[in-house]
Design a protein with these regions (language model features):
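Tryptophan-centric aromatic hotspots in well-structured domains and transmembrane helices
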Residues: 1, 45-46, 86
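N-terminal glycine/serine-rich phosphate-binding loop of ATP-dependent small-molecule kinases
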Residues: 1-41, 65, 69
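Structural signal for hydrophobic packing residues in well-ordered secondary-structure cores
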Residues: 3, 7-11, 59-62, 88-95
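Gly/Ser/Thr-rich active-site cleft segment
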Residues: 22, 49, 67-102
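Short, acidic Gly/Pro/Ser/Thr-rich loop/turn segments
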Residues: 27-29, 52, 94
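A conserved hydrophobic position in a structured secondary element of the catalytic/binding core
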Residues: 32, 59, 79
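Short alpha-helix plus adjacent loop in nuclease-associated cores
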Residues: 44-60
Length: 102
């Protein structure tokens, strides 16, 4: 409703919106269907460490330093990228929806 109200107030069509930023507490991560806005899974809250095995695989591959140099952030299950990788590996719809692109 908020987004609809803002679009209406701005006097634009929804197709003109190129992106949307959402702020949340810490590094909580969520994925949703861009066509209908429905979540594809429950959000992973910032302190959840379910992506620790993904981080271990990255560490074992020798790419942890590259992650740190590229992002400025040490590899961690709290890092949103590791949560996104968890969604990609564990929620059937996520890779399918992600591969569809914009």
């Amino acid at each position: 409703k908020v987004v609809r109200d803002v679009i209406e107030k701005a006097g634009i069509r929804r197709e003109q919106v190129a992106g949307l930023g959402i702020s949340n507490q810490r590094e909580t991560s969520a994925v949703w269907d861009r066509t209908d806005g429905h979540p594809l899974a429950d959000a992973i809250v910032w302190q959840c460490s379910r992506a620790k095995d993904i981080c271990a695989r990255v560490e074992e591959s020798g790419k942890a330093e590259w992650v740190r140099r590229t992002t400025g952030i040490n590899l961690s299950p709290y890092f949103p990228a590791s949560k996104l990788a968890w969604f990609m590996e564990n929620v059937k719809e996520v890779p399918q929806k992600a591969s569809g692109g914009p």
